[in-house]
Amino acid sequence: DVHVPPGQVALARQVARDTRRAGLAVASYGSYYRVGEAGEAPFEPVLQTAEALGAPVIRVWAGRRGSAEADAACRRRVAADARRIAALAAEAGLRVAFEFHANTLTDTNESAAALLAELAETSVGSYWQAPVGAPAEYCLAGLRAVGERLVHVHAFTWHRQSRARLPLADGEADWRRYLAAAAAVPGEH
């Protein structure tokens, strides 16, 4: 939402037109909405902007605390808000999906799977990316844990020890495995 800030509906419509003219499609609105953080920006302008863009999916973040720091009240708050925004998005024919990321409730395979399981009755999905510094087997386990909730894959390659970003080709062997696992998941992503 840096390029098309929430609430800037006219700009979103223009970007949608420009995107279609270029022969492209909007795959997602990459918002920075923090689920469960009521004191922050509201979801409704995010939803309106995604609609104007023609984005079928809105990326959201599972709170502001990592799973190790989150207490039960935090988890309940995130789950309740996720249900609320998923319902709003569904009314508009859209879907929300969590960023799979550090310092949120999707920062471990187990926590991400637990959150998605708690939201089983909703259409909430998940992005997936290989966690920085994690071994390939752990990354694959996370991708499998997301399973049929997979919406999109973020492709990056990081040096496991230094955590420096590398050319994607440097991770080719791992990415062949990740993409094969993603391809085995039903649906488009």
Language model regions located:
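Acidic/histidine-rich catalytic cores of soluble enzymes
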Residues: 29, 84-175
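N-terminal pre-domain/capping segments
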Residues: 1-57, 83, 90, 121, ...
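A general structural detector for well-ordered alpha-helical segments in enzyme core domains, enriched
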Residues: 11-18, 42-49, 74, 78-85, ...
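Short, intrinsically disordered, charge-balanced linker/junction segments flanking boundaries
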Residues: 1-3, 173-189
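Flexible, glycine- and charge-enriched loops at secondary-structure boundaries
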Residues: 5-12, 40-43, 68-78, 105, ...
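A short acidic, helix-capping loop that chelates divalent metal ions and anchors anionic groups
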Residues: 1-3, 35, 64-71, 135-137, ...
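Active-site groove signature of glycoside hydrolases
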Residues: 50-71, 92-102
